[in-house]
Each structure stands twice: as structure tokens, then as C-alpha cells.
């Protein structure tokens, strides 16, 4: 199936093409029509399968840009994922010429700046649950106008650490809102919680025989700590001719900033 047949919106199809995304993945083929119809959805698919676009495209197309109300809330567990989703939403809006206002809200950012930004009446918010709940309690986010809630990385957000916060956010909204949740895994614990909050959800599970995106090659290098940066630079130079985009994952924010500075210096 083509994006034209799925989305029925040429501007969005062209926006995807500008990112060299021309054919839908399996999760996108199944999820996009369901979300466009307003169904609640649980989507389980392997990392790299295109889950973010599976919900972003229909969510943006369902947004009433003429309204000044918040319509969509996307919850993600980490600051990095929030920013990634937010930037993808912004890019789609720009390239599809959608007059939709998006805002990212993360815990480490200045809350007063976020409150000021909320006065611009975003249609879509992407955020981490803790700060989102803070702003709801401060009555800076009106949950009564939200029509769609997306939970990204549901097993992470519905674990014992985040479960109460996420449930409190969802309960602050109208019951007839649309709720969708996505992850590479779906524990019984997460599914039990979602069953209490969803209305006859469609469950979409994409099996992957290799348990990974077939277009991703896995290998690892063992290196002394002092040699890591040198090895990373060699690897990046080796991949430079064949890789258009390269993602580097780290588990430490300050170290990440330091690495970016070093890579820029040693171009």
C-alpha cells in the first residue's frame, strides 16, 4: 500500500518524500488508518520500524489548525526522545505546510519559559510525564480540550516508576479522548493498565523474524576508555561515504555535550 492510499493527503506524502520516505512500513500500513478513524490503538513493533511516523502523520492530519485549543498530547520517557519526536513533528508541519503549533516540554527546562510558550496556544505538545503533570496541576495545560493522547515507549512509561504519573495525566482528560500506545515490547502489566483506559483498542503487533530492523547491521568494538574517541572518529570516517545519517546514543547528558564539542572541533 502507498502513502497516497493511506493518508489521502498529497502535501503530507510530499513532506515524507522530502525525507526520502516513500513507502510505508508494516506498522504504518496498519496503524495510520486506525488512528485516522479515531480508534484507540496499541502498537507493538521492533525498534526502527517507523512507529513515530505511524502516529505523527494521522495525528497531524486530524488536527484542526483553525482552533486555538490544545488537541494532542504525546508522552515520552526521556528528554532525548521528546526532542526527537518534536523535531519530526515540526519538520512534517513545515514541509506539508500545516499551520500547526507544536511545543516540547521536558523536566530540565525552565518551567517559566514553558508557561510563557504555552500562551501561544500549541495544538500539540510532546513532553515527559513529570513536567506535564506539574503544568496540569498549575492549570497551565487544559486537558479538557485534548482529543488524542499518544504514549510512546509504553513499557517504560507504565512501569512502577512512571505508572501513577501517567495514569493521573490520563484521568484528567475527558473519557471520550483517543488513546494510543506504542513500544517494541508490550508487557502484561502495561496491557492491563491500558485496558482500563482504552475503548475497544485495536492491537497491532508486527513480528520480526530477525528481532531487528533487517536494514540495520549490528557489530561492536572493544576499546580502552582513552581510545574510545579515536575509534569513534575512525568509524565515522569509514561510514561517511555510505551513511547519510548517523545516530550516536549515550547514557549521560553532559558527556554527550562534550562529545558533540569534540566532534565539531576535530572535523
What are these regions (language model features)?
Residues 2-267:
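Conserved helicase RecA-like core
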Amino acid at each position: 500500500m502507498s502513502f497516497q492510499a493511506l493518508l489521502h493527503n498529497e502535501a503530507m506524502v510530499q513532506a515524507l518524500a522530502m525525507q526520502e520516505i516513500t513507502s510505508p512500513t508494516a506498522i504504518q500500513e496498519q496503524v495510520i488508518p486506525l488512528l485516522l478513524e479515531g480508534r484507540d490503538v496499541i502498537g507493538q513493533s521492533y525498534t526502527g520500524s517507523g512507529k513515530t511516523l505511524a502516529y505523527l502523520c494521522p495525528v497531524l492530519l486530524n488536527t484542526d489548525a483553525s482552533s486555538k485549543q490544545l488537541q494532542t498530547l504525546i508522552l515520552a520517557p526521556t528528554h532525548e526522545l521528546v526532542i526527537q519526536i518534536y523535531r519530526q513533528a515540526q519538520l512534517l508541519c513545515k514541509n506539508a505546510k500545516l499551520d500547526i503549533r507544536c511545543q516540547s516540554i521536558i523536566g530540565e527546562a525552565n518551567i517559566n519559559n514553558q508557561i510563557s510558550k504555552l500562551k501561544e496556544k500549541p495544538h500539540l505538545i510532546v513532553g515527559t510525564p513529570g513536567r506535564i503533570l506539574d503544568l496540569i496541576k498549575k492549570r497551565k495545560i487544559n486537558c479538557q480540550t485534548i482529543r488524542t493522547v499518544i504514549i510512546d515507549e509504553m513499557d517504560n512509561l507504565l512501569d512502577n516508576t512512571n505508572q501513577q504519573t501517567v495514569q493521573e495525566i490520563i484521568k484528567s482528560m475527558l473519557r471520550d479522548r483517543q488513546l494510543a500506545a506504542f513500544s517494541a515490547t508490550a508487557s502484561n502489566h502495561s496491557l492491563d493498565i491500558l485496558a482500563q483506559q482504552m475503548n475497544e483498542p485495536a492491537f497491532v503487533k508486527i513480528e520480526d523474524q530477525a528481532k531487528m530492523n533487517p536494514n540495520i547491521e549490528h557489530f561492536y568494538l572493544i576499546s580502552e576508555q582513552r581510545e574510545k574517541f579515536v575509534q569513534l572518529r575512525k568509524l565515522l570516517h569509514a561510514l561517511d561515504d555510505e551513511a547519510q545519517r548517523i545516530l550516536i546514543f549515550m547514557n549521560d547528558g553532559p558527556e554527550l555535550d562534550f562529545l558533540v564539542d569534540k566532534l565539531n572541533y576535530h572535523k
